[in-house]
Swiss-Prot record:
It comes from the Eukaryota. Belongs to the AccD/PCCB family. The lineage of its organism: Eukaryota, Viridiplantae, Streptophyta, Embryophyta, Tracheophyta. This is Acetyl-coenzyme A carboxylase carboxyl transferase subunit beta, chloroplastic. Pfam families: Carboxyl_trans. Residues 222-491 form the CoA carboxyltransferase N-terminal domain. Zn(2+) binds at residues 226, 229, 245, 248. Signal peptide: none annotated. A zinc finger (C4-type) spans 226-248. Its main location: plastid. Residues 26-49 are annotated as: Disordered. Transmembrane segments: none annotated. Residues 32-41 have a biased composition (Polar residues).
Length: 491
């Protein structure tokens, strides 16, 4: 059971609230705004003090605004101090619906009475934040207390996504992604341990909290939410961080253009076959959206003509041929155009004796093109056979999340060196397909890169920020060296 300090301030007109948390329960120190209320009259009243019997509780319900917040702590004691400096211990046990106060006073009796009334009547008093579905059930009472506590936190704490890169071990903090005004990062790091909740006493769902706040919808122009820890990353600098979550290190998806910028030296990228587009070869029938219209919509959305970009460039001065698949374009599905562009890239590299790097990110063959999409597996594999076995050239396959289906069954696993990104989802058939087909449960994490690596499926797991250096060393190991400054790759 954890103990928390709260500082309550009451005024004659309304209930103001402030929050104080501290490592030392005997001597609490503020972590938020320590300058007092912005209202001078409230500051004066707080300094002078007044008889608790004169307090007006006409706006007491403001403290108990009901919102759909995440589950708070199930078994905690809060040390509460009113404006007179009197301290009280408030015990919450949400699971067993227990609310106890250790010191009887006018204020605390009103507070306890409010909670009792809530339990008995469902808190049917008017509340401008009230939702109709919160009237009864244990879930309602849970959220009632959550909002009570959140009202303190939100008054002093500013939502932000980044505390410190060194706080990864505190993923279960209730205030995991908050930054306190007026405190530097080192201070926050040192105090973060004091507000870490016990694993035995809390089960905090970070995803639920962010969904409650509608952060993705309201602030998606500012933040990128991590798929793993559900923390927020500042969008303006996210690309410079290589789309790696600053809070947990998870590798989020990248567009093909971002990967090209990451891997290829500036000013050396020369794309190939950009004008090649699909023409709906089998006239695929769709009740929702015609295939041709769907292609057009993805072209507008992504700025690409197809789900792969191919071309030549330099990697630390070494000329390479590279193809980068883009999952944002119809899930990176492999149709006839994708297969043709990759095949032409390999044939070009064969004629010029260039190393080939293909970055895979695909859901598999494109169903809208039927057997033509399946034939791309054989076509690309045939081109690689000539490239690798006959010409003895070097091919590196990079598997990113997700790499599944026909890509996994063909060129994705044919590299001389196969590299995967951390936590990448790599499989032939997806979890749901396997479970429905075999009627067996697929163990969690069995299709992650780390699991497959230990089974020998590929050669190495390389973090994104180290990838370019690793590729450079591999190329030099296989006899490829940087060009002279005056040399250029000619097509």
């Amino acid at each position: 059971m954890e103990k928390w300090w709260f500082n309550l301030i009451l005024s004659n007109e309304e209930l103001e609230h402030r929050c104080r948390l501290s490592k030392s329960m005997a001597r609490p120190r503020p972590i938020g705004n320590t300058n007092g209320s912005q209202d001078p009259s409230i500051n004066d009243r707080d300094k002078n003090g007044s008889d608790s019997g004169n307090y007006s509780f006409s706006n007491l319900d403001h403290l108990f605004d009901v919102k759909d917040n995440l589950s708070f702590i199930y078994d905690d004691t809060f040390l509460v101090r009113d404006s007179n400096g009197d301290s009280y211990s408030i015990y919450f046990d949400i699971e067993n619906l227990i609310f106890e106060i250790d010191n009887d006073s006018f204020f605390l009796s009103k507070l306890e009475s409010s909670f009792s009334n809530y339990l008995n009547s469902g808190s049917k008093n008017y509340n401008r934040y009230y939702d109709s579905y919160m009237y009864d059930t244990k879930y309602s009472w849970n959220n009632h207390i959550n909002s009570y506590i959140d009202s303190y936190l939100c008054s002093e704490i500013r939502i932000d996504s980044y505390i410190s890169s060194g706080i990864y071990n505190y993923s279960e903090n209730y205030i995991y992604s908050y930054v306190w005004n007026g405190e530097n990062v080192s201070t926050i790091k040192s105090r973060s341990s004091s507000i870490r909740t016990s694993a035995n006493s809390s089960d905090i769902n970070l995803k639920g909290r962010y969904n409650d706040f509608d952060i993705n919808i309201k602030y998606r122009h500012l933040w990128v939410q991590c798929d793993n820890c559900y923390g927020l990353n500042y969008k303006k600098i996210f690309s410079s961080k290589m789309n790696i979550c600053e809070q947990c290190g998870y590798h989020l998806k990248m567009s093909s253009s971002e990967r090209i910028e990451l891997s290829i030296d500036s000013g050396t990228w020369d794309p190939m076959n950009e004008d090649m587009v699909s023409t709906d070869p089998i006239e695929f029938h769709s009740e929702e959206e015609p295939y041709r219209d769907r292609i057009d919509s993805y072209q507008i959305k992504t700025g690409l003509t197809e789900a792969v970009q191919t071309g030549i460039g330099q990697l630390n001065g070494m000329p390479i041929a590279i193809g980068v698949m883009d999952f944002q374009f119809m899930g990176g599905s492999m149709g006839s155009v994708v297969g043709e562009k990759i095949t032409r890239l390999i044939e070009y590299a064969t004629n010029r004796s260039l190393p080939v790097i293909i970055v895979c990110a695909s859901g598999g063959a494109r169903m809208q093109e039927g057997s033509l999409s399946l034939m791309q597996m054989a076509k690309i594999s045939s081109a690689l056979y000539n490239y690798q076995l006959n010409k003895k050239l070097f091919y590196v396959s990079i598997l990113t999340s997700p790499t599944t289906g026909g890509v996994t069954a063909s060129f994705g696993m044919l590299g001389d060196i196969i590299i995967a990104e951390p936590n990448a989802y790599i499989a032939f058939a997806g979890k749901r397909v396997i479970e429905q087909t075999l009627n067996k449960t697929v163990p969690e994490g069995s299709q992650a890169a780390e699991y497959s690596f230990h089974k020998g499926l590929f050669d190495s797991i390389v973090p994104r920020n180290l990838l370019k250096g690793a590729l450079s060393e591999l190329l030099q190991l296989h006899g490829f060296f940087p060009l002279n400054h005056n040399s250029q790759v000619k097509r």
